[in-house]
Amino acid sequence: MHYIRELLIVVFTSCPALSYAHSSLDGSRYCRCQPGEACWPSLADWQALNSSIQGNLVEVRPIGHVCHEPTYNKAACERVSKLSSNGTWRANQPGAQQEYAWEVSLSRNESCYVGPDNPTEPCSQGRIPRYSAMVETTEQAQKAIMFARERQLRLVIKNTGHDSGGRSSAVDSFQILTQRLKDITFIPEFTPTLGLAEGTYKSKGPSVRIGAGVLTKELYAAADEHGYTVMGGECATVGIAGGYIQGGGVSTALTPMLGLAVDLVQEFEVITAEGRHVIANEFQNQDLFWALRGGGGGTFGLVTSVTMPVFGAMPAVISELTFESQEPGEPFWRAVKEVIYATRDLSTGGNSGQYWIGRGPTGSYFVRLTLFFIGEMDTGKMGGKVGSLLSALQDQEIGFHLNSTAYDRLSSFLAIPQGEFVGGIAFHQENILIPRGFYDSPEGPAELVNRLAEVKLNPGDMWVANALGGKVMANKDSVDNAMHPGWRTAAVLLVGNRIFEPVLEAQRAVQERMTAVEGPLLHSLGPPGPVAIYLNEADADLENWQEWFWGEKYNRLRDIKRKWDPDDLFLVRHGVGSEDWDEEGMCWIQMSIEECPVREPSQCTCPSFGCPMRHVPGLL
C-alpha cells in the first residue's frame, strides 16, 4: 500500500505544474477554473483586463435574456426578435451563435430562446461565454490570451459563430471575439515573409491580406471594387479567416477550377498559446502553416489574418434549373438521378455546380440546380449544355424552369449577399465526401438516389451537393496540407441539413436521428464508399471523427498541437487533442502513463494547471 502511494507521488511530481485549479480527489480529472471557485477571476481582475484592452471587455448574457424574467423587456425583446435572423448582427453579438443549437446546453438542460412567447420560462447561460474580449488589435488579443492562460480559463474563439459542431461556444467560458479585425489589404505583388530564410523569393502575384473579422460579403465587395475575383463561400456572413478556411473552405463557384480555399493560402498571422505573434508560411513555422491549412479553427492559435491570391475578372454564365413535386414519387426521384448525372458530367468538363433537394414550408419537394460556366458569355448555349437533362425531365413529365444570366465579371455576382438573413435557425448538419469512383460506377447514382429517398424530409430540411473534382483532385501531388487525403479523390460533397423547433427535446431528437440512422445510411454507400467527412459541416456527435476528418494525417496534427499548445489552451469540440478532455473541454480526462506525449515519463508536460493523475495498470 505504501508502495502504491509513493508511486502515485512520483507520477504526480514527474509532471511540472505551475499552479493548480479545481481538482477532483478521485485522481481522475483536473479542471479549468469555473465560476464560483476561488480561482475564478475577481471583479477587480476583470476590470484590470478591461482597462488593458481599452474597455473592450463585456460581461455576456444570451441575446434572448430580454425575453425572459426577471430581465424581460417587451420593446427590447421585440427588437432582438426582429434582428435574430440577421447573420451580420449575430456575428457581432458575443451572446449569440448563428445556430440556436450551440447557444443551449443539452447536458445541463439550459436554454434562453429568443421570442416573446414564454417570458416566465427560465433563461440560463447555456454555452454562451461569461465574458468576451471584443478585440480591435493584435495587442489586445495577445493580452486576452495571456489572461486566459494565466487564469486557467476555458477559452473560445468566436469569429462569426457559423459552426455546426459547437466549436465557438462552451459552458462557463471566456470568449475572444474577432469581428472587429476588419482589415482588407490588396497587395499587387505579394512576397511571403522570409523570416530566417536566406535569399529572395519571386513574387506570387496579386494577393489580399484578410483580417480575422472580415465577412464573406465584405471580401467579395472589396474584391469586385478592385476588379478581382477571390475565393470564398456562398454565405454572406461567414468569416473567411476563421473556421471556413482553416477547415478547408469550399466555393460553389470556384472550387472545381481553383481547388479548396485552404489550398491557396500563402501566409497566416497567428497569436500562439504563449501570446507570441508569429507568421506561418512555407519559409517559417512551416509545421504550424501545414496544420492551419485544414487542421480546424480555434485549435493551434488565434489567426489574426490570412493572405491568399486574387484573380482577374472572370466572365461567367450562371444557369439555374428548378422543379418541384407535391409527392416525391418515382418520376421525381428519376429526375433527381438525371440531375446527379448532369452535375457529374458537367463538373468533369471543368464547370462547377450545386444542387439542392429539399422540402419547402408548404410540404412540397423541390430541386434547384445551379451551374457555373466560367469563361462563357452566351446564354443561348446553355440549353445545349444541359440538353440531355432537359430531355430526361420532359420524358418524366416533370415541369421545370430554366434561367441563365451572363456576367462579364463573376465577382459582381459573388458581391450580391447570399444567405444574409438565415441566422438563428435551429438546425443540425451531416455530410459525406463521395469519391469519383462511386459516381462513375454504373450503380452509383442510382444507389445514392435510393438512399436519399429513404430519408424522410420535414419542411425546411434539405440535401445540398457541391461538385468537387477538378483542381481539388489535381492538387493531390502539388499541395501538401492537413486536409484528409479523401478530398483528392472526391467528386461531390453532400451535406444534409435538418431543421428543428427551438426546444431542447426537438434538438435531441434530430441529433439522435442523424447520428443513429441517417449517418450510417450514408456511410454505408458503395463500394467505393464515402472517403471522408468535411469537419466544417459534420454531425456534431460523429464517432471516430479523427479518422473521418483527417485520416492518416491526424497523428502529425497531434504532434504539432503538442508542440505549439501543450496546455490545450485552444480547444474545440472534435478538434485535434480534444479527446483528452470532457465534452465541454473543461476537465482533462484520465490518461494512462503510456499516453504521456513525450519520450520519458519524467519529462511529461501537462497543462499548466496541473497534471491529471496517470493510471498505472495493475495498481489502480
Swiss-Prot record:
EC numbers listed for it are: 1.-.-.-
Q: Which Pfam families match?
A: BBE (PF08031), FAD_binding_4 (PF01565)
So which residues have sugars stuck on them? N50, N86, N109, N403
Q: Where is the signal peptide?
A: 1-21
The pathway noted for it is: Alkaloid biosynthesis
Q: How is it used?
A: Notoamides have been shown to exhibit antitumoral activities. Notoamides A-C show moderate cytotoxicity against HeLa and L1210 cells with IC(50) values in the range of 22-52 mg/ml, but the IC(50) value of notoamide D is greater than 100 mg/ml. Moreover, notoamide C induces G2/M-cell cycle arrest at a concentration of 6.3 mg/ml.
Glycoprotein in keyword set = yes
Alphabetic keyword roster: Alkaloid metabolism, FAD, Flavoprotein, Glycoprotein, Oxidoreductase, Signal
Q: Name one GO molecular function term.
A: oxidoreductase activity
This protein's cofactor list reads: FAD
Alphabetically, which GO biological process terms does the record hold?
Answer: alkaloid metabolic process
Its biological purpose: FAD-linked oxidoreductase; part of the gene cluster that mediates the biosynthesis of notoamide, a fungal indole alkaloid that belongs to a family of natural products containing a characteristic bicyclo[2.2.2]diazaoctane core. The first step of notoamide biosynthesis involves coupling of L-proline and L-tryptophan by the bimodular NRPS notE, to produce cyclo-L-tryptophan-L-proline called brevianamide F.
PANTHER family assigned to the protein according to its UniProt record, in alphabetical order:
BINDING OXIDOREDUCTASE, PUTATIVE (AFU_ORTHOLOGUE AFUA_1G17690)-RELATED, FAD-BINDING PCMH-TYPE DOMAIN-CONTAINING PROTEIN
The record's comment on protein family reads:
Belongs to the oxygen-dependent FAD-linked oxidoreductase family.
Q: What protein name is recorded for this chain?
A: FAD-linked oxidoreductase notD
Species of origin reads: Aspergillus sp. (strain MF297-2)
Coding gene?
notD
